[in-house]
């Protein structure tokens, strides 16, 4: 006897992907997440392709994963997808030390963040 299957937390027309342990501050990651929020998936991919931010590569990977989840796991139309959510969460903060003069030391904070992207399929009448 196995455990009962957990109910799906998203509606049937949505798919999501989560990128964890991204080595960037949540504030900088949110700048890139704001670019793609509410946009069509294809336009968001194009924006990330030509963004000069370092973390845009990881955001693009996460968006491509969400699109692949929508297509393969939920049978959604890739051309009708929009980025309905792109939210950023805090991760751990690694603390390192840097030697300073006179025997002192300074702290270096190395923050991590996580990104959740939810894509939703819009109907033909809504996108027209």
Swiss-Prot record:
Gene it is expressed from: rplV
Xref: Pfam families: Ribosomal_L22
PANTHER family registered for this protein in UniProt: CHLOROPLAST 50S RIBOSOMAL PROTEIN L22-RELATED, LARGE RIBOSOMAL SUBUNIT PROTEIN UL22M
Cellular compartments per GO CC: cytosolic large ribosomal subunit
Entry similarity comment: Belongs to the universal ribosomal protein uL22 family.
Listed SUPFAM superfamilies: Ribosomal protein L22
GO biological process: translation
Family matches, as InterPro entries: Ribosomal_uL22, Ribosomal_uL22_bac/chlpt-type, Ribosomal_uL22_bac/org-type, Ribosomal_uL22_sf
Keyword set, alphabetical order: Ribonucleoprotein, Ribosomal protein, RNA-binding, rRNA-binding
Function of the protein: This protein binds specifically to 23S rRNA; its binding is stimulated by other ribosomal proteins, e.g. L4, L17, and L20. It is important during the early stages of 50S assembly. It makes multiple contacts with different domains of the 23S rRNA in the assembled 50S subunit and ribosome.
Full protein name: Large ribosomal subunit protein uL22
Signal peptide, first to last residue: none
Subunit structure comment from the entry: Part of the 50S ribosomal subunit.
GO molecular function: rRNA binding; structural constituent of ribosome
């Amino acid at each position: 006897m196995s455990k009962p299957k957990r109910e799906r937390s998203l509606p049937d027309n949505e798919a999501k992907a989560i990128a964890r342990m991204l080595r960037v501050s949540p504030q900088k990651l949110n700048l890139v997440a704001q670019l793609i929020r509410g946009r069509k998936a294809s336009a968001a991919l194009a924006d990330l392709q030509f963004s000069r931010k370092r973390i845009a590569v990881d955001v693009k990977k996460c968006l491509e994963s969400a699109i692949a989840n929508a297509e393969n796991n939920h049978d959604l139309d890739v051309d009708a997808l929009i980025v309905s959510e792109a939210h950023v969460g805090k991760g751990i903060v690694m603390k390192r030390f840097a030697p300073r003069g006179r025997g002192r030391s300074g702290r270096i904070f190395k923050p991590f963040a996580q990104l959740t992207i939810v894509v939703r399929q819009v109907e033909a009448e809504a996108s027209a």
